[in-house]
Amino acid sequence: VKAVIEETGFSKATLTKYVTLLNDRAMDSGLELTIHLEDENLRLSIGAATKGRDIRSLFLENAVKYQILVYLLYHQQFLAHQLAQELMISEATLGRHLSSLNQILSEFDLSIQNGRWRGPEHQIRYFYFCFFRKVWSSQEWEGHMQKPERKQEIATLEEICGASLSSGQKLDLILWAHISQQRLRVNACQFQVIEEK
């Protein structure tokens, strides 16, 4: 417990609250995961069917940086005061999270400035692909797998290739198609401006 408190900067009371919250959320989502806080030790118990991506998703869902990235996938831009209000944080806190996030994004030659992505479109998509490949929960994967348009895309690609895709290849295709679809949708007005010129 001491090492976790030092690493996170949480008080023991805050850590206890987070452990309770995570356990409740795991139970609500049907995830076989429990964090035990016993004396001065933390212990993680996971079921055999629990996947790493489900654990990462559980921990990240309410993280501010994660929510910023998800917001920008589905929206072209944000105004700081509106996003801060939506995330229920101060603008100063949002600014600190954006600064920290930009340090991470610099590895991809990307940044978020004035509420918008800055960087090459292919890098933005590649970043989202690498990121969501690790953090999408099994439920999210399954939800996208069941969409008729995704099933059709898989069938079409298998027909063109003359081979069946593995489950991993199908998941990669579904993720890439989802990211591309969202990026095209949020950038539609930019493409319209280019077409008009």
Region annotations inferred by a language model:
Residues V1-K197:
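A cross-family "folded-core" feature that marks the main globular domain of proteins
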